[in-house]
Amino acid sequence: MADSDADTTDAPSLRTPIVAVLGHVDHGKTSLLDKIRGSAVSEGEAGAITQHIGSTAVPLEVISTIAGDLVDPTDFDLPGLLFIDTPGHHSFSTLRSRGGALADIAILVVDVNDGFQPQTEEAVDILQRTETPFVVAANKIDTVPGWNPEPDRPSKLAIESQTDRVQSDVTERLYEIIGELSSADFSADMYWRVQDFANNVGVVPVSAETGEGVPDLLTVLMGLSQRYMRDEMAIDV
């Protein structure tokens, strides 16, 4: 019977994917994590968010609330996401390298005003060497001149609501980052244009300050983990 085939009691138990956050100093790694934490705390029940030094566990139900219509919790059997911060200073490159290697997936935070910087390139090298899947959080879109804040809104919609001039400016900055990824031998595009995340890097425009793109970022991370790393998340119970 179809019902027995769909019985979820035989589904494997899955662990929480570990998400490393990397990027150049002052590009907004910690601010982005703080925004995710803040959104999670405000949307979750007391005690739902587990925080340790340098790490934050955000359960699926909280991610679903933050992401809104972008995430249907019934589509996922992962328990949530565990974010780990990695030190931004050059002297911590060894520790950051270890953090990258320990992660299942990573967020590479890049300031849309600065593009790739030395520690960005170092982070990309770490991700290449450890073969860690990653997405790019193109941060600080709220600092583009003329940007009209759309707090906590999906970034594609937030960008489309801006004036033509601002849209053009944002798009130009994003494609400069995509070009830099191409120079590092990564095929990349705006996340909503990527059909094959196994072979292409998704770029998610975000604002750690006003929250645009945070729903998208969480959605992409959950989707990548569920679709491409589900077997790696399976645990014996």
Short names for language-model regions:
Residues A2-T86:
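Conserved G1/Walker A P-loop phosphate-binding module
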Residues A2-T9, A40-G47, L60-V71, F92-T94, ...:
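Active-site phosphate-binding and catalytic loops of NTP-dependent enzymes
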Residues R15-D26, T30, E172, F186-V237:
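Conserved catalytic-core segments of large NTP-driven translation/proteostasis enzymes
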Residues T16, I53, P79, L102-I105, ...:
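Short glycine-/polar-rich loops that comprise or flank the Walker A/P-loop
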Residues V25-D26, L32, I49, D85, ...:
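Residue-level signature of catalytic and energy-coupling elements of molecular machines
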Residues S39, I63, G88-H90, V112-F116, ...:
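Conserved nucleotide-binding/hydrolysis micro-motifs of P-loop NTPases
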Residues S93-D114, Q128-V135:
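Inter-motif core of Ras-like GTPase G domains
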Residues I141-D196:
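GTPase G-domain guanine-specificity segment
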